[in-house]
């Protein structure tokens, strides 16, 4: 596409050089800029990428978007704008032909449950023989092909490219985990959502947002912006068991479907039965009551299942068809995942990293604990420490607790575990500043019949260490290796 055509929608700009050049790529990553690319520089929290403009010029890039004029060769066109990332969004959606308009787009937000709900929607679509894509904490997936991702919600250009990739692969729908960071930072500008789903709102990310009010406002942006084009059928799915849904109902102009277990809602779960093999319940709907069975464990997953079913149903699939699909879904990786049922202990990994998430996790497993419940939890570095003692208090619902860091980054691991220990309500705990050693200790003290829960990371494949270096780490593999060494069995899978 000709650059002059691309920039027609950008009204506030100063152009230094010629826009008469062909463009086939936009990037915010200086390492990928080349001839035919537009490089968009920005001022981030840690890095000002304007300093890479000369490097991209050396790589053959002839067009940069900047917030102030740079000292560059005369053959490099500079487009100076006040907000480079907002312009990046406009350019990306224009160049890639508004890809989110070409499929059904589901957006899932909330403190806990985003990954589970989003993954369930994707898996239901696949069971229905529909081409589907997923993007979130567990990476990027088109049908069954997976690639890793860096952020729950990538920056705007990368996100648009992923949606375009899904469209080109024939995806009929795409499900996005929508983080509060992504909403506030404008990473989702221009994405056309068809269905927005809310799970819950509990304390998290106050290091970024400052207050719960600001955090809640960030989440609400998905719902308030959903109605920008009222000519399309768009829907909102809200959890009535969370009081924040009342506010979200007031900010969206779209039709709302509610679900709940404890509070009255249009769609409800009754007569709940739970085990470590899954759940069953009566799904009470405006159209009748249906029996639902699922391999997902825990009462909180019933809420997630309902949210996913309603979202898919809202776009035209019958509930009967969806329920059949739900009964045969695969587990969501790293979400209340029981590792190797042949072991004499119940070894479980989960992503729970807030007090609310941990409470729900313990609620889910405690009825099935045969002997002791051993619970390992970590605290992330450079995050909101005000939530940490409450996490320690909740963890002490278990018989024995192990406190570790989780992605300590530049914080002192001993400080992080000490913050967790401030909330301890009994003395049956120990602190490890090395998470892997903490996991090995959990297995070492476990006896047949015990339940060992490794919380906070799920299947996240790394630890963020000082200097923000990512070091390979897998809770599940470390736990299984230690368990096989102690109890026999194996080998450890990948």
Swiss-Prot record:
Its EC number is 6.3.2.7. InterPro entries: Mur-like_cat_sf (IPR036565), Mur_ligase_C (IPR004101), Mur_ligase_C_dom_sf (IPR036615), Mur_ligase_cen (IPR013221), MurE/MurF_N (IPR035911), UDP-N-AcMur-Glu-dNH2Pim_ligase (IPR005761). It comes from Staphylococcus aureus (strain MSSA476). Catalyzes the addition of L-lysine to the nucleotide precursor UDP-N-acetylmuramoyl-L-alanyl-D-glutamate (UMAG) in the biosynthesis of bacterial cell-wall peptidoglycan. Keywords: ATP-binding, Cell cycle, Cell division, Cell shape, Cell wall biogenesis/degradation, Cytoplasm, Ligase, Nucleotide-binding, Peptidoglycan synthesis. Pathway: Cell wall biogenesis; peptidoglycan biosynthesis. It comes from the Bacteria. The modification N6-carboxylysine is found at residue 219. ATP binds at residues 110-116. The keyword NADP does not apply. Its main location: cytoplasm. The gene is murE. Carboxylation is probably crucial for Mg(2+) binding and, consequently, for the gamma-phosphate positioning of ATP. Signal peptide: none annotated. It is found in: Cytoplasm. This is UDP-N-acetylmuramoyl-L-alanyl-D-glutamate--L-lysine ligase. It catalyses: UDP-N-acetyl-alpha-D-muramoyl-L-alanyl-D-glutamate + L-lysine + ATP = UDP-N-acetyl-alpha-D-muramoyl-L-alanyl-gamma-D-glutamyl-L-lysine + ADP + phosphate + H(+). Pfam families: Mur_ligase_C (PF02875), Mur_ligase_M (PF08245). A motif (L-lysine recognition motif) lies at residues 406-409. Belongs to the MurCDEF family. MurE subfamily. GO terms for molecular function: ATP binding; magnesium ion binding; UDP-N-acetylmuramoyl-L-alanyl-D-glutamate-L-lysine ligase activity. Coiled coil: none annotated. The keyword Nucleotide-binding applies.
């Amino acid at each position: 596409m000709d650059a002059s055509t691309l920039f027609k929608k950008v009204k506030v700009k100063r152009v230094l050089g010629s826009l008469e050049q062909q463009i086939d790529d936009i990037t915010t990553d200086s390492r990928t800029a080349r001839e035919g690319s537009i490089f968009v520089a920005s001022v981030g929290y840690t890095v000002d990428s304007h300093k890479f403009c000369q490097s991209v010029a050396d790589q053959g890039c002839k067009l940069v978007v900047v917030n102030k004029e740079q000292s560059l060769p005369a053959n490099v066109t500079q487009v100076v704008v006040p907000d480079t990332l907002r312009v990046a969004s406009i350019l990306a959606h224009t160049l890639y032909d508004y890809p989110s308009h070409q499929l059904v787009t589901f957006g899932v937000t909330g403190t806990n449950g985003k990954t589970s709900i989003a993954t369930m929607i994707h898996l239901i679509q696949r069971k229905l023989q529909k081409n589907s894509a997923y993007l979130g904490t567990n990476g990027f997936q088109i049908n069954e092909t997976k690639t890793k991702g860096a952020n729950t919600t990538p920056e705007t250009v990368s996100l648009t490219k992923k949606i375009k990739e899904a469209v080109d692969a024939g995806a009929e729908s795409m499900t996005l985990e929508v983080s509060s960071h992504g909403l506030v930072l404008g990473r989702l500008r221009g994405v056309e959502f068809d269905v927005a789903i809310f799970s819950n709102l509990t304390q998290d990310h106050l290091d970024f947002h400052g207050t719960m009010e600001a955090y809640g406002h960030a989440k609400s942006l998905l719902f308030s912006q959903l109605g920008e084009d009222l000519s399309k059928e768009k829907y909102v799915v809200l959890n009535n068991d969370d009081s924040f849904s009342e506010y979200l109902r007031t900010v969206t102009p779209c039709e709302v479907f509610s679900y709940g277990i404890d509070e009255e809602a249009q769609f409800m779960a009754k007569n709940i039965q739970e085990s470590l093999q899954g759940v069953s319940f009566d799904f009470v709907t405006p159209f009748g009551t249906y029996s639902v069975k699922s391999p997902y464990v825990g009462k909180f997953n019933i809420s997630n299942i309902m949210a996913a079913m309603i979202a898919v149903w809202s776009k035209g699939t019958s509930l009967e068809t969806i329920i059949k699909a739900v009964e045969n879904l695969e587990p969501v990786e790293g979400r209340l995942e029981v590792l190797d049922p042949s072991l004499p202990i119940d070894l479980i990994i989960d992503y729970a990293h807030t007090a609310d998430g941990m409470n729900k996790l313990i609620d889910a497993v405690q009825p099935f604990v045969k002997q002791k419940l051993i619970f390992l939890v970590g605290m992330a570095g450079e995050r909101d420490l005000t939530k940490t003692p409450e996490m320690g208090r909740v963890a002490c619902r278990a018989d024995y607790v192990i406190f570790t860091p989780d992605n300590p980054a530049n914080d002192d691991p001993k400080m992080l575990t000490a913050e967790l220990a401030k909330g301890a309500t009994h003395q049956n705990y120990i602190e490890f500043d090395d998470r892997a050693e903490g996991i090995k200790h959990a297995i070492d003290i476990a006896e047949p019949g015990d339940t060992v829960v490794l919380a906070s990371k799920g299947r996240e494949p790394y630890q963020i260490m000082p200097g923000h270096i990512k070091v390979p780490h897998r809770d599940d593999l470390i736990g299984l290796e230690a368990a096989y060494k102690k109890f026999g069995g194996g080998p450890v899978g990948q």
